[in-house]
Structure formats: C-alpha cells, structure tokens
C-alpha cells in the first residue's frame, strides 16, 4: 500500500507515520523514477524516506528501521523484522527473479544518500522480504499479551509473512496466474493485473508494486 513508519534503535517511532494518502513526495518520486528508470509512486516508503532526506528532516540520521503497517504489526507480534514480498514491493522495487529487493537500485539509492553522511545503508533498515511459505517467526509472549491481555492466548503460533490488502484480494479472487486480474472498488479503485513479463519502460499510470511469484501491476 505504501506506508512509512520510522523507528530508532530503541524502537521508538521518530515521526508520526505517513500513509499512502500523504501525497507530499512529488520531488522525491520524480527523482527516484528518473534514477531507477522505474516508476516510483509518491506513496511508496522509499519516496517518503528520500523526501525526508531532501527536506533535511532531523530524524533521518537516527533511523534504524523503516516499516509498513504490516511489517510494524508483525514486528510487535513476533520480534521479526520481515515482510511479505508483495507488500515489500510497495516499499521498494523488487527483483522478480531473486524475489528480493532490487540490489542495483539499492546501490544507486545508497550512492544518492552517501553525501549526507548517514550511518545506515538502505538494506540494513528495511524488513527482510519473504515469499509465501517461508518461516516468518512465531507469536512471542509479548505479542500474545498485545492481542490478549487476559493471558489465555499462548505464544508459539507460527506466523506467515505479513501481506497487505492487494495480495489478499488477488488470492481471494483467484487472480494469481499470468493474464488474470481483479478490480478493487474499496478506498481507491484500481485494477491488479498479473503480467507475463516486465514492462518495456516505466509508465506513470502503472505501478509495478505487488509481486509474489508473479509480476503484477496496479492501475490507479
């Protein structure tokens, strides 16, 4: 979906979280789209992060973890800083062959941020991307208490990689095979189409932002 939570080493949130409706990142979005030759929508986590850098926001130097809502909740329940590949692709572009963040683009971003002298590198502060079926941790005692303060819920329940609503909708409508798709008519209206191959070039109207084992595009 594209949400940005920023935390320091103590696990404290640095600024109020920024949602997919905070369209305040046009400068960063345009700059990163040009740098990567890949459409970076304003709502993506990486656009929010780079806009904070461009704005010279004081907290950026203290970032230890950047998360979406799904990654944040999973972290609180399991202690694991991981994210399903679909939601991870709404943070930063992913490599559909390696099923991980695109390393060449990470290197480009680190080069872009280098003159600012931050102690962190991008990959170090993002949740690890996991695909469906991979182990994503178990419910901890602390997590169980968050869900059920009465103590009846016990820890140890295995957890799957956390995902957002778009991937959930694709599974629910059985739209996961190539050349299939679905239309969401919720908070926003968009089509989610599973493509057969990469697009030949970036299009502002098409976000390549939801990938599990397929390449999907959402038209907003």
Residue ranges and their predicted role:
Residues 1-217:
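Glycine-rich phosphate-binding/catalytic subdomain of phosphoryl-transfer
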